[in-house]
A protein has these predicted regions:
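A short helix-loop-beta-strand connector motif used in the catalytic cores of GNAT acetyltransferases and
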Residues: 57-70
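Conserved GNAT-fold acetyl-CoA-binding loop/helix
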Residues: 33-55
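Acyl-donor (CoA/ACP) binding surface of acyl/acetyltransferases
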Residues: 1-37, 68-170
Length: 170
């Protein structure tokens, strides 16, 4: 099976998230915007983050060859965000998601990383469609999703969730 190993853009390296990234996963999952717009994943310790990586990210990657990826700024070597393509219950089309540490938001990294990952899954994995979901309140994500060429389709609700989400597709 084909697997994403390393992607590169002008300013970024993009790698599958590994156990060595537990400190970053813990930090980004506990930012106020992540909790508000994506949800509280109850990651409170490094061990919680390691288990989350093992039980969610690594299993998804092994099954599909793609999943959640770490975004590293080339010029500094800093871990700045994550971008991923996910096969998710309740969605017929894999969806793209992204998150950043607050100090790296609004610099175009989300578009750069997401566009590269989308290009890769369309070309190398034969995906014909991609989707995205976000809340009504998350205007920044809506803007990025639309900039990536996805179009709003409808409001949806994922299984076992009580939040209405905007559903986009390309």
């Amino acid at each position: 099976m084909k697997k994403i190993t390393k992607l590169e853009t002008e300013r970024l390296f993009i790698f599958p998230i590994s156990l060595e990234d537990a400190d970053f996963v813990l930090a980004v999952h506990n930012t106020p915007k992540f909790i508000e717009f994506i949800g509280d994943r109850n990651l409170r310790t490094l061990e919680d983050a390691e288990n989350y990586i093992k039980n969610r990210f690594l299993l998804h990657y092994e099954k599909h060859g793609f999943g959640n990826c770490l975004i590293v700024e080339k010029s500094t070597g800093k871990k700045i965000g994550a971008v991923g393509i996910f096969v998710r219950d309740g969605l017929d089309v894999p969806d793209i998601g992204f998150s950043f540490l607050p100090e790296f938001e609004g610099k175009g990294f989300g578009y750069e990383a997401s566009a590269k990952l989308m290009e890769t899954v369309f070309t190398d994995f034969g995906l014909e469609k991609i989707s995205a979901i976000t809340t009504n309140e998350n205007i920044a994500s809506q803007n990025l999703i639309e900039k990536l060429g996805l179009k709003y389709v409808k409001m949806i609700r994922l299984p076992d969730d009580d939040v209405d989400l905007r559903y986009y597709e390309k």
